Amino acid sequence: MGSDWDEIKRLAADFQKAQLTSTLQKLSERNCVEIVTLLLEKQLLDVVFTVDGKEYITPDHLEREIQDELYVNGGRANLVEVSKALNVDLSRVVSLAERIAAENPSIHLELGQLIDEEYITHIAQEINEKLALRGEISISELASQFDLPSEFLQHKVVEKHLGKIIKGRQDTTNPRVFFTQAYIQRCKAKIRGALAAITRPTNVAVILQQIGVQEKIFHSLLDEIAPAGQVTSKMANAQYVPHVYAKTQSDWVSSFYKQNSFLEYDAIQKLGISDPKTYIRKQFPSEEFLFLKRVALGARLVELTVVTALNECSATKQYLDLSSILPSNLSEEDIEEVFAAIMAQKQSNPSNFVYLDSIVFSQPYLQQLVQPCQALAETQAKAAIDSGIYQQHIVEKTLAQKGNSSAQDLEDDGKVDKRDERRKKAASGKAGGGAQGRETKTKSTKKHARGRAAAAQNDSDDDEDVHQNTKGGGGGGNKKTVKPLELVKTADIVKLITATLEEEGLEHLAKSIASLYTSQFNQTALARAQELFEATPQTNRRQTHAAIQDRINTLLVDIRLYEKGLKLLPQDTQTQLVKYLLKSLGNDICNELSLYVAAECNLTVKNSNLNVDQRNKLAQECDAQYRSALLEQNKALNKSIDEFELATEAVLKACSMIIKKVDKKKDRLLIADHKKKLQEQLLECNDPALLLHLAALILFTTISGCILHASGKFVSAILQHIRGSLSDPQNALLLRYHDLVLQVLQSAADSSESKIAHEQLQAMQTEVIDLAQNYSRASVSKAD
């Protein structure tokens, strides 16, 4: 136990000795770096390294050094400069600066700068000194001077110390402007003095330039000053008008109007008034004005002088010189405008007056003045008829009006006609042979005196086609115009009225007055000439009426006789012959009546051989009394013969023509005459095809006692019909002749076959002619 106690004492002595003993151990730089690195890795130590990495410092110490830099720089330190001075990375400086600004309300971080309250107080004192010196200052100027944000300066500096350090007040209209009361008083004094010295309208910009006051302060203080005048607006071109000048203007305008009863806009504008009409309305609110382009007339002047004088002029049937009752300052344009305005207001009837060069004529006065021109119009109309001028004008006018709209159509239709005729020519040249339906090309028979329409459909005269095309072609697309016919000219009227006007001193208006009535009297003369023109040809028209009536009746008798003959043939052939009959003789009847109606309606038609389309167009241009009847007649050409005759009767009735009663006693004479003419043509014929055609028609008439209107393509049908009435040698002769004609037409003209066939036809020609001329049967008398 004792030994243990001794051991304890010994150890205590050693410990005390160790405590009392001081030992110094120096670490190397490498050891220090390793120790610090180890502490950093174990997050037992937080340090900030310098930029070169050779030194480090704790964040707390760095924060104290940043605050020291802020103090050293007078309360405003740029963090970039602080970073360079402390040799520390800028990001660590910015981070600590943000913490400093957040923890300390008296320190602010703005645009990378630390600013404390001492610096803010300092710049507030500078702002106060500047404001006291200038009297007015703006935040934008301070921001430029101190290189600080305008919001920071306004809220954290100026407004915070306004009324304390900064002695001034804030502009209510512009919170970014501050000024002193003394400055406001000085501006008021300048404005008041300048406005008091002005005696005429002056531009506000000129006033501000002279007194050195800003425009915004001028307008804000103007109401407080209450000057003896007014500013026209707050725009850049505003003017200040003193009351003394406005009163002078008002007095001058009132005096001028009282003396003259009108106001000139130019005179008012010379007073400095930009809108004369508005000023006049304000100046005379109870007065009524007639506002013209150049002047404003008082309503009393217009009512008491002009309107009264016009009514008197109308009542006395005279004329009025407006320039004598209106102010002499008014020009002729002003006077004309006054007259037009009065007429527009319907204070007088406009139709009662005519205005010419400030002179107003009543209509009765002018009617009396030009009364002698009625006789002139009558004389000129008669002279135009006697000389033929009017007739020539009618022809030219009709050609222009109708030609422009239909000449091209008629030309095109003429071309269609030519193609139709060529097709018919080709069709008419074929004739059937026996039961095999062989056809022979023949020419159409010549038209006899009564059946003048028979050749219309068979016409193959190429020269006539060329002639028609020549007349219709060329220039069809060029629009023609006819100069209006002037029977009464302005110069003629001037000669008649000049003497009367000279007595009144108005001869200078003679031409103007004459031009007003030239058209009227020219129309009167033209109407009278038309009456004379219509009365002149009545005798000729009656003769034409009778001649056409006879021709139509003759054609209707022919159609009746031809219809009787075609009914002897088979039904299918009858239908074709009816169609052919209407397209030939029926077409002629339609043409005759259409041309007659066109003449009655004063329409000019160049081509007398019209087709259906041309007649329809012509009917549309005719008077209403003819139109429907002509259109129905054209439609009936494609129907039966009975329907066509009914339609023709309607047209004849519209034309005041009559249809002669049927006299069957004359039918035998007409048939004999027709046969005789066919025989005459047969004797003169040398063409084999035409000779066969004529022979067939003559034999048909001899055998049946009826006449037939048929083209060459019906020859085979006719031969088939008369076959039973002929002997076998006669049938063989006609059939052989028909076959040879067909052979000639089908072979080449210079071939040997054609020559042989032609020689055989020449040899047989006499026999065929003799058969047609001398054939007779027991039931047919020699007279037939």
Swiss-Prot record:
Keyword set includes Cytoplasm: no
Chain spans, region Disordered: 401-481
GO cellular component: endoplasmic reticulum membrane
Top-level taxonomic group: Eukaryota
Signal peptide extent: none
Keywords, in A-Z order: Transferase, Ubl conjugation pathway
EC number: 2.3.2.-
Gene Ontology molecular-function annotations: UFM1 ligase activity
Family note: Belongs to the UFL1 family.
PANTHER family: E3 UFM1-PROTEIN LIGASE 1
Function: E3 UFM1-protein ligase that mediates ufmylation of target proteins.
Name the UniProt record assigns to this protein: E3 UFM1-protein ligase 1 homolog
Lineage: Eukaryota, Metazoa, Ecdysozoa, Arthropoda, Hexapoda
